Amino acid sequence: MTSTKKTIADMHRLTPEAFAAARKVPVVVVLDNVRSQHNVGAVFRTADAFCLQGLCLCGITCCPPNAELHKTALGAEQTVDYTYYPDTTDAIRALHEQGYKVYAIELAHNAVTPEQAIENYCKQPAADRQGVALVLGHEVFGVADEVMAMCDCCIELPQYGTKHSLNVSVTAGIVMYAWAQALRKQTDY
């Protein structure tokens, strides 16, 4: 069988208005002092692609409108909801109060794989699954220690090469996809 590229019409994408009204996958991405505007834009675009609930932009993380962010977001900064917090700990506190399970994505002792975290989350009674927050940190320093201490669990992506880490927007894309796919199987989004 030969594959051919899809046209824009073949993709049946939502309009911005339909996206705003669509039921979102209950995943919020928290960016803890992410310095690269391009990384922030890429996370916006990926959150739009998977119809996630939104973003929390914290500390030095840039907010729209921003020309550099727009270069990678390609307009997703206009469709994906976001909230700015000067301090990431305030974002984590607010998410916990709303019933979210908060996961730091970090290279850490006692971390679990995305698959393990998803399995454990999905085993909980539906009433206890209010949503998931995925915390990604600064490109050099990672998730701040005080933020990690507030998280319910830490997720680490297993890596097998010579480098110590992945780019933050690549990591975000991997975990966002994993959670979106798993939660879509659980409920009709």
Feature locations, PLM:
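Post-transcriptional modification and biogenesis factors for structured RNAs
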Residues: M1-Y189
